[in-house]
Structures are given as C-alpha cells and as structure tokens.
Amino acid sequence: MPDEVTELPNLPDVTAMEFIVNGERFAMDQGTLQSYLRTLDLHTGEATRTVQWKSPAGAALELTFRRFVSLDNEHIAAFSVEVTPTNQDIELVVNSGISTRNSNTGSQHCVEGEMRMLPGGILRLMTHTNESNVPISVHCLHKFSAEPSESLPVIERRRFVGRYTFRLAKGQTLRIEKLTCYHTGRDLPFTVYGQQRGTTNPDIVAAAGDALAAKFADTGYDALLAASAKKWAAYWAEQDVQIESDDSFDQLGMRFALYHLNIMIKRDDDRVGIGAKGMTGEGYKGHSFWDTEMFLMPYYLLTDPAAAKTLLGYRWRSLPGAFKKGQREWLSGCYVPLGECMAGRRRSNAALLRCGYRHRQEQPGFDRYDRAAYLCGYCLECLAVLPSHRR
C-alpha cells in the first residue's frame, strides 16, 4: 500500500515441528499437560523446554526441546527434540521442514519460492522479498537416533516438510536433530562496500547455503552448540557484570540485559541498526529510534568501541536521505526521522491528527560535536548544518 513503510521482514520459518501420536496431534491445548518447564541458559544461549503430556487417547510422552542460534556462525540455527513414550508403544509421525506461511501481522514479504530436496536429504527453499528482490536460501537437514520406517518429502502451499514415521516402544527415546541455515543476498560476502543491496543473483546465495548445509552431515547439534558456547564464554569473560545483592534476581536481570545487548547488534555491518524491540519481536517494524543513542550507545562506547563505531556508521549512511528530506521540507540541514530503517527509505508514516495538522513522527535534530576524533577521521559530514530559518 502507498502509505506503508519499510519493515524488518520475518523470514521463512524453520522452528515448527509437528508430532502425530497414534493419529492424534501433539498440542498443549489438547489432551492433558502434566508438567511444563522452559529455561534459557544465558551462558550458552540455549533455550530448553521439557513437557510431560498425555494424548486424549491416553498415550503419555516426555518431550525435551532444545534450540539455539549460533554465535559462532550467524547463518546457523539448530534444534534438538527427544521424545519418550512412558506408558505404551506408539506410532509417531514427524512433519518438519520450512514454511513461508508466516507473516508480519498479515503482510507476507516473501514469495512462495522454489522447493527442492538435495542429496543427503537436505530440504532447500529458495525465495526472495517482494519489493526489494533480496534472494533468500533456507536449508535444513534432519538426523535421527533411529531409522524411520517411512520417509518422504511433502510439498504443500508455502510449506516444504519431510514426513517421517517411527514406531517407538515404551521407554524408548527418539532424538531428532534439525540443523538449519539461512543466507541472503544482503550477506556481507555478496556486498561491495557502499552498496547496501548486495546481490540479486539467487544462484550465488543458493550455492553458499548448499555448501554450508552439506557440512551438517559431518557434525551435529552438540558440536554446533559447543562452538557457539565457546564464543559465549569469551563474551562473558569480557563483559560480565557481577552484583552483590540479597536478591539473586538482580544478577539475573543484569545478565539477561547483557545477553540481549550481545545478540541485538551486528558488529561487522553498519547497514543495520538496533530495532526498538531488539530481538524480542516485530514491534515498531524493526526501526531504530533515538533510544539507541540515548540508552545503548553509552554501553557500547565503554565496553566495545568497535560496535559503537558500527552504530554511528549506520546513522552516517542515512545522511544523504536525511538531507534530501530536509530539502523537501525547505530546511537547509538534514531532517532525521524518529524511526529509521534502511538508508534512503521512507521511515515514519504520516498520521492525520484531530487538531487538523499533518504530523510526521520525526524531528529535525541539530547537534554539535567538538574534539571528536571519529568525526574528523571518518565522516565530517555528520556535523549538522544549522538551518537559516526554522519552520
């Protein structure tokens, strides 16, 4: 729609795994939920859920779900599920793969794409964004502790899954590993400095994903987690803040904040900022607000100057668009939006207020920086041009 603004799109989903137990779908709002526990290990970045569940027909199961996004290799997300029937033998059908049925509150930013099974049982989805035509490849490989009695690929509308059937004896534990990777045309290896868009060639992106997914055959969930946990250990050794308090929640709260400060920034890419919701959801459409400089920049300046430089570089990239907007508004300086996304793109949509004035969620900002070595050596144009008049 003409008045919509750029937003951070949700990419195809690899998290969903469907379990059919003796013909009945596992769902916590059906049957009997006997116990549930969810934890996040801040030291390793691994999330775990443990569930005890009884189907409407009476089959009891224990399930343990584990997942993480790798800090060692940003392309990788891995999942592990253990299923144990505790009171009877069962037939278990697992549907797991890649889905493009997800959306941003109803807006689907990716086309349905091309689905293919590669050698070794690797599922691949090739798609691209609707407007900017950014190519995206998603790969996943499943590993099982027991061989399925039946295995076949299933292609549905906007979903590509493998369907695997197992017969488990009472007390037998089946372990499922799902190893996945994402690549896009905006990835740094495909991007020449100064060009935000990267490549629109899907073959290049697919080849990168194919090469990484092929390595999954020689590794597994535990090895990938160990590599990621090693990077987390280095982070905590450098950045941990210890609090003396009678309430242990104070220490937990501090480390939870540090955890998010580590995952919400891409230190090697100044084309992206930090969304107002960080990595917790799609609120504010993934736009960066002045909260970044007000609340987050001091932390990075003190603990990680290279990350702070990246965030400043992100703002610097938006200056050409801000100056153009200033010209459109009859200002001699730059007109910086309250909420910012990609440089040169429209950020904040207009709202018609009851007072009768047309209001935009943006303000002209004018700051003067003195004795700033960063500005002198990197971008003097960041010095704001004071307007000769104000509207």
Residue ranges and their predicted role:
Residues 1-284:
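Acidic/polar, glycine-enriched structural segments that form the non-catalytic walls/loops
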Residues 58, 71-72, 384-391:
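A conserved hydrophobic secondary-structure block that centers on an alpha-helix together
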Residues 224-390:
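Substrate-binding groove/exosite segments of carbohydrate-active enzymes
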